[in-house]
Amino acid sequence: MENSEFILEAKNIVKEFDESDGSIHRVLDGVSFGVKHREFLSIIGPSGCGKSTLIRIAAGLETATSGKFFLDGKMVSGTGAERGMVFQKYTLFPWLSVKQNVMFGLESIGYGKDEAEESAYQWLQIVGLDKYASYYPKQLSGGMQQRVAIARALAPQPRVLLMDEPFGALDAQTRSQMQKYLLEVWKNIDITILFVTHDLDEAVFLSDRILTLQANPGKVKEMVTVNVPRPRTEESLFLPEFVTLRKHVEDLIHPVSETKPQEEKFNIINMVGKKNAAK
């Protein structure tokens, strides 16, 4: 493990849940992959593939039934400051100011108040919110709240930033702005990002590689290398390589064999509708 090319590595992750009828539901089935140092790797797959469960196991928020995650060659056990986490839902404490929210994570790992305050302010400068340090979460937009959450996750200087659909609750315009902002932060600091999304464009736009999963149970379908040149802008979405890659990822997640029965169902509905209209 010490000679691995990966900073974060999943080895044969299996996750099972007990159902109310006594049966066992396997969500993840032998998932293995690695994330390289300073890489931006996204996980995408159909509903029920276990992508959020997988990243929660990486964060130490859930335990795998079998299999392990390794960080810098050492087995991951429980949560740790070396892994920052950002969720889809806004997880800021409403009774704390913006600065106090960022300080909270630092003080919880042993920073003194003065040191935590100085570091929090520096990170708020990095995410462009230092002027809002005394504001409370309810006074901020959704995008600004997620920037605070990112600052809080990055302040302890983790080795890896884990992000579970962090922009899923944002409107399209804010989401696009946050994607570009995240790439700018990632470019300028020493951080590796593992990012869960259900959005094809987002996965291709952000990532160096994309891990595609199949569902029921969740298994690795294919690891896709993103050959779209950086830096990426709105114009990147119209590049031939972007369009081709997006189509390839879409076909992996929703194969023709799965979409055809659905198309046949709609054809039957249309035929019945035409017959009824002719009566």
List PLM regions with ranges:
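Short coil-to-helix segment of the ABC ATPase nucleotide-binding domain corresponding to the Q-loop/switch region
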Residues: 96-104
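Catalytic Walker B motif of ABC-type/P-loop ATPase nucleotide-binding domains
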Residues: 161-164
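Conserved ABC ATPase "signature" region
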Residues: 103, 107, 114-132, 184
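Helix-to-loop junction immediately C-terminal to a conserved catalytic motif
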Residues: 59
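Conserved signature/switch motifs of ABC ATPase nucleotide-binding domains
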Residues: 135-138, 156
